[in-house]
Amino acid sequence: TFAIEGVSRSLLAQITRHRIASFSVQSQRYVAKDNFDYIIPPAIEAIPEAKKLFIEAMEHDRETYKKLGELLAASHEKELTEAGKDPKDAQKAAKKMANEDARYVLSNACDTKIVMTMNVRSLYNFFALRCCERAQWEIRALATEMLRLVKGVSPVLFKNAGPACVRGNCAEGGMSCGKAVQIREKFANL
């Protein structure tokens, strides 16, 4: 079981494609994201103008989320109060109702928290696919860190875990990164 924090909703979409795992994910419905953190991809981080534009977009999303939340909460609170709900309870319920729709403006870069459970066989499959150089950078970094952690707990069991090229030929065929020797060395020393 892994507790994963500081990853994007984009990573969440990828990792939940592994149906061989059990997931619990932080709710955007019940957890307000007024001051959400976000993940900046390294390629964007490396270009000052791109980074500036990205941060501006995230700040705009944050402000839009807050404003939508306020507008929706006020509307829901009024409806609930008029329907006879206690004002304090109406305010609390209205905020949660507002989050439901305001969250649609949030970017895939928005951070989230995940708890994931996988058995050893499933982990081997996950590592073979997601530690590969062809995997998207964020999930590759997560998979590599997860592998490092499990190797620390059970080095014999996970000795041969990693991308497919660690145990034999690259599974990517013509799309191979061409770095099998370096990859094997990297994962042998992980």
Language-model regions: role of each:
Residues 1-190:
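Family-specific signature for flavin-dependent thymidylate synthase
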